[in-house]
Every structure is written in structure tokens, then in C-alpha cells.
Design a protein with these regions (language model features):
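Cys-dependent protein tyrosine phosphatase-like superfamily
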Residues: 1-139, 152-245
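Ser/Thr-glycine-rich phosphate-binding loops at phosphate-binding pockets of nucleotides
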Residues: 144, 148-149
Length: 245
């Protein structure tokens, strides 16, 4: 099945879970976010295969990998080898045993805050890359397309004035789209994907609500935060145009 005719959010791919377009949300000035500009998803597993043609239809021209250095070494992104794609890798959270131990002892939203406070330089690089991206869609991904990807998606939607409830709803959709993979992994004996044993696999609305509240109360707004870490007003305006115009 190919990408939508231009006005559907979910993108069905053979080798990628949790893939969707950020288009279709009401935003500032009575406008709506545009389809085919920003795609969020998890990492592709295996070779690109038929997904290559589907992504070319959109067309995806820029990919930003948000995973940790260890993750990308163990499982390199298939997008990095695509000749027609500009590939960037900027770590927002390093997933390792120390991180897992830390995140298990605190609410998930607090680990999201670490991406703002402990990875400022990389966060700035993500938005520099988005602003400078050539014409075509920007696809950004982590491992599951839920946490680090969810952070960037929330910030993009916030930049153009999408309502908080819609931002939270966009985050929650991962619960549904990841279920088939989680069930398969648990059936194969991988209990790490059991949501009852690992509640951080869930995309609870409270997690994104608290993250957005922290961002606004601490920095004033997403735009103010990004400006504070070195993303220029001109770059932010360019990003807004990409998503709205």
C-alpha cells in the first residue's frame, strides 16, 4: 500500500512501525498543518525494499536519526545508505543500562526533560537541520518512534500553535500502532516488551502533558526554549513555513 493521496495521517510501510504524517492538525491563524512535510516513525528493520518507493512518493528528502550512538552502531539506520536522502544523526537520549536504571526510577516525562537539559547542543542541531532541509519531507525517527520522536513532534506542533490536546493525542497514537510489534515480541519470549512489566513502553497522556507543561513553565514556550539554545528566529520562521504554508 502506498502513501496516502495527501490527506491521511497514517503511513503503511512494510519495514517500519508507528509511521505517520504530522499533517492535518488545526494550528495558528485558522490554518492546518500540511501533509508531506514532516514524517515521524520508528527505525526501519531490515533493508528498505518496497518502502523505498513509498517514501520517494512523499517525497522524503531528509532523515534525522534521534537514537543514541550505541543504538546506531548496533543497528545502523537503513536511511543512511539511501543516495537520495540527506541523513543526520543527533542523539537526544542515550539508551544504555545506566539510562534504563534511571528511567525506571522516575516518571517517563522527566527523562524527556533530560533531552532538553542534557542534550541542548544536539537538540539545536536537530532544528538547524530541519530549517535547512531541502524541499521535500523531513522524516525523523528513534527506535520505536515514541519517546525521542514524540518529543520532537510535540515541539514542532507547538511551534505552529497546535492545541495541547492534539499534541497529546498525536503522542498517544503510538500505543495503538506499536501493539502488534509488542505482542509479537512477547509471544517470542521477549518480556522486555511486556507493557505490564515495563510501563514506560506506554504512551500515557499524562507523560506528554507534564512534558509540555514543564517546557512552557520553564522556558515560556517551545520557541523561547529553542532560541535559548541557539536556533535563530529566522530558522524557526522557516520551520513554521514548512509545516504551515
Amino acid at each position: 500500500m502506498s502513501h496516502n493521496s495527501g490527506n491521511a495521517r497514517r503511513i503503511l510501510l512494510d519495514g517500519v512501525f508507528n509511521c505517520r504524517d504530522l499533517g492535518g492538525y488545526p494550528c495558528a491563524g485558522g490554518k492546518t498543518t500540511k501533509f508531506g512535510r514532516f514524517i515521524r516513525c520508528g527505525i526501519p528493520f531490515g533493508p528498505m525494499g518496497p518502502d523505498r518507493a513509498r517514501l520517494a512518493e512523499i517525497p522524503v528528502k531528509t532523515v534525522i536519526d534521534l537514537r543514541g550512538n550505541g543504538e546506531s552502531k548496533v543497528a545502523p539506520s537503513a536511511y543512511a545508505k539511501e543516495p537520495d536522502i540527506v541523513y543526520h544523526h543527533y542523539t537526544l537520549l542515550e539508551i544504555n543500562p545506566a539510562y534504563v536504571e534511571k528511567v525506571e526510577s522516575q516518571p517517563l516525562w522527566e527523562s524527556y526533560v533530560c533531552s532538553l537539559t542534557e542534550h541542548k547542543e544536539n537538540m539545536a542541531q536537530v532544528f538547524h537541520a530541519i530549517a535547512a532541509a531541502p524541499e521535500g519531507a523531513v522524516l525523523f525517527h528513534c527506535a520505536l518512534g515514541k519517546d525521542r520522536t514524540g518529543i520532537v513532534a510535540a515541539m514542532l506542533l507547538s511551534l505552529v500553535g497546535v492545541d495541547r490536546l492534539d499534541i497529546i493525542a498525536d503522542y498517544q497514537i503510538s500505543n495503538t500502532y506499536l501493539q502488534p510489534m509488542f505482542r509479537t515480541m512477547v509471544e517470542d519470549g521477549n518480556d522486555i516488551f511486556d507493557e505490564e512489566k515495563n510501563p514506560h513502553l506506554k504512551s500515557d497522556p499524562e507523560t506528554m502533558e507534564k512534558f509540555c507543561t514543564y517546557l512552557d513553565e520553564t522556558y515560556g514556550s517551545t520557541r523561547a526554549y529553542l532560541e535559548s539554545i541557539g536556533v535563530t528566529s529566522e530558522e524557526l520562521d522557516a520551520i513554521v513555513r514548512k509545516l504551515m504554508d
